[in-house]
Each structure stands twice: as C-alpha cells, then as structure tokens.
C-alpha cells in the first residue's frame, strides 16, 4: 500500500480526520437547506450509501436557522458552507454544526474572523479553508498572471496564517481546481508546505460519466502519492452517485476497510450465462455492505475460480449451472436458476462473520 503523508489529526463530530485514520468520504446536499424535511431525507440516503460527512450550503439566515433541526435527525457530521457573511457562521455554530467551511480572507475585517474563530474554538469545531483555482484573490492572480499551484498554496498559507495568528489550529484545507493537472500539482505542493489534513476534490468535474472519469484520474493520481485525508467526488448528478464513486475509488487503492468489492470479467464468446445482468444485480446487493468482502462473478467455469483466488466468495457460470467457490476453491455446483440466490446467501454468511470479527476486535482494543 502507498505510504500515507502524515498530517495532524482534527476532530469533526465523532470522527477524526488526518493522523493515522482512514480517508473519509464526503458529499454535499442539493436541496435548499431551509427545507429541513427534504434535506434530512437526502442526507439519510447519503448515509445509507456510505457518506461519512455531509456539507450543506448556508447562503442565508433561513438556512442557518435550519441547522439545529437537521442535526437532530441525522447521524453523520454536518458541515456548513459559508461565504462572506460571518454572522451565518456564528448561527451555524450556535445550531450545533460540526465543521465550518470558510475562507477567512473573504469574511471581512479581523474582528469578524475573530468572532468566528472564538465561537469555533469554544465548541471545538474545526474550520476548512477552501482554496479554489477559480476564485483566487486578486493580488495572487496579478502576481502569477493566472491560477497556478504556487498561487493556490500561497492563498492557503495566507488563510492559515490568519487562523494561526488567532491561535486556532483545528484546520482542514482543500485545494480544488477543475483542471486535473493543476489540482494534482497544488495538492502535492500543499502536502509539502503544511501538515494540516487535506480534503481532496476536482471541482466542477462534470456529469456522472465524464465527472467520474475526470475525478478518478485526478484524485487517483493524488491518492497514489499518499496524499489526502477526506474526499468528495463532485458530479452534476444525484449526490448518492458521488458517494458510490468515492467508495470505488478508495477500494481501488486499498483505502476502504468498510466496503465490499465486486470482481467480474469483461465477458467473451465463451460465456454461457447472462453475466452482465448478474454482475449488476450482485453489485447492487453488496453496495451497502460495510465490510471488506470481495465477491466474484465470472463467466467461465474453466478459468473463473483460479482468476479470482483473492475473492472471499464467487460464482463461475457454465451451461445450465454455476460453480460456487471460496478463495479459489470450488465449494459446490448449483443450478443456473438459483445460483445468484445461493451466492447472496453465502455473501450474507461471510459478511456477518466479518462484522462479528470486527466487533470483537473493537471490544478487545
């Protein structure tokens, strides 16, 4: 596994970001925050999908006043996204928000920033500094001519210093850009410049398909260097899709111990079963499991089990039947019409065993 960059730990609600902790998956609601019922419903869907921290826009007082009601009805940390008006940050903090996303430089005069910092410090709430290539300060753009990684790091350090001068150190930083190469360079330089946890993202990445590819390319490159402590996949799509993509990305790098993985072959002329529909059905079935089970769905009974030795459980199709196997060893043959149900039963058994083992380990710690 890639060696992770060391950062200081920062508490966000009941989670700790940074330090030696796993990467945390975030998303953002698409509802009007003042519509508490709709916002809570969307957050619960995100929770079910595996979202661990959720951010809401707080553009006005109605949204800020809704924070307390939303907090009462959800189970994951809530982040307030604030721009310009420091009073909205104060109201969000008063309502029990778990983290505030601001840029200290656009909040206003020092006394306004100090008011937010003091309120956050009193409640033990961290602040995320959100640097974005598309909204860098004028003096930085004048200095560099256009958005650059060095300019983004300079902006981050400027905002960090504002908070540090007020003796505030519960800081998380993001360095977002829609240009993949720029984002990669900015995060690399940020990781060398300071040890605060980094929230990863490729902003304005696009629609479900294009945005998934773009985010995977950019964030994959960053993750491969051991950089990052939280991430959001930004898509013009249902935010649940953001969480699904994030989970798959982390699994690809061995960075998610709480998610199931599907192994399936690309199909060929030897296949005797409807492998594509079976693989999709099984993928949906395991999508909400919170254990690191590996499941294989393969179309060839000759090579299938051997090609998926690392799978905890799997099925390999043949004409009229399937081979059920564990760790590459055939367990039994099952009729084609029942093989998916038999596979699901085995998945349930193994997932329960893994969950019990994890609970036992927790109790022994």
Swiss-Prot record:
It comes from the Bacteria. SUPFAM superfamilies: Dihydropteroate synthetase-like (SSF51717), Nitrite and sulphite reductase 4Fe-4S domain-like (SSF56014). One of its GO terms (molecular function) is iron ion binding. Gene3D superfamilies: Dihydropteroate synthase-like, Sulfite Reductase Hemoprotein, domain 1. Its cofactor is [4Fe-4S] cluster. It catalyses: (2E)-4-hydroxy-3-methylbut-2-enyl diphosphate + oxidized [flavodoxin] + H2O + 2 H(+) = 2-C-methyl-D-erythritol 2,4-cyclic diphosphate + reduced [flavodoxin]. This is 4-hydroxy-3-methylbut-2-en-1-yl diphosphate synthase (flavodoxin). The gene is ispG.
């Amino acid at each position: 596994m890639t060696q992770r960059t060391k950062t200081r730990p920062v508490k966000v609600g009941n989670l700790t970001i940074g330090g030696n902790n796993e990467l945390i998956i975030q998303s953002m609601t698409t509802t009007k925050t003042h519509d508490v019922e709709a916002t809570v419903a969307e957050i619960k869907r995100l929770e079910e999908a595996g979202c661990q921290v959720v951010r809401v826009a707080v553009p006005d007082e109605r949204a800020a006043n809704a924070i307390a009601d939303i907090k009462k009805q959800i189970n994951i940390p809530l982040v307030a996204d604030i721009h310009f008006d420091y009073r909205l940050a104060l109201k969000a903090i008063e309502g029990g928000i778990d983290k505030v996303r601001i840029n200290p430089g656009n909040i206003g005069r020092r006394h306004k920033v100090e008011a937010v910092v003091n309120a956050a410090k009193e409640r033990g709430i961290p602040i995320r500094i959100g640097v974005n290539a598309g909204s860098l300060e004028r003096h930085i753009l004048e200095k560099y001519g256009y958005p650059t990684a060095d300019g983004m790091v300079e902006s981050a350090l400027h905002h960090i210093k504002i908070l540090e001068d007020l003796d505030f150190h519960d800081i998380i930083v993001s360095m977002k850009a829609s240009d993949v190469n720029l984002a990669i360079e900015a995060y690399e330089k940020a990781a060398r410049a300071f040890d605060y946890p980094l929230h990863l993202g490729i902003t304005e990445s696009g629609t479900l398909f294009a945005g998934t590819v773009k985010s995977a390319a950019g964030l994959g490159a960053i993750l491969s260097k051991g950089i990052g402590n939280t991430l959001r996949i930004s898509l013009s799509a249902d935010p649940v899709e953001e969480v699904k993509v994030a989970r798959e990305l982390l699994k690809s790098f061995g960075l998610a111990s709480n998610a199931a993985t599907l192994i399936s072959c690309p199909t060929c002329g030897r296949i005797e079963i409807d492998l594509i529909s079976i693989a999709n059905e099984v993928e949906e079935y395991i999508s909400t499991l919170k254990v690191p089970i590996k499941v294989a769905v393969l179309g060839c009974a000759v090579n299938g089990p051997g090609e998926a030795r690392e799978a905890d459980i799997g099925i390999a199709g043949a004409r009229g039947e399937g081979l059920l196997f564990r760790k590459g060893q055939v367990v039994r043959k099952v009729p084609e019409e029942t093989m998916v149900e038999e596979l699901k039963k085995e998945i349930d058994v193994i997932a329960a065993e893994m969950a019990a083992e994890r609970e036992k380990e927790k109790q022994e710690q």
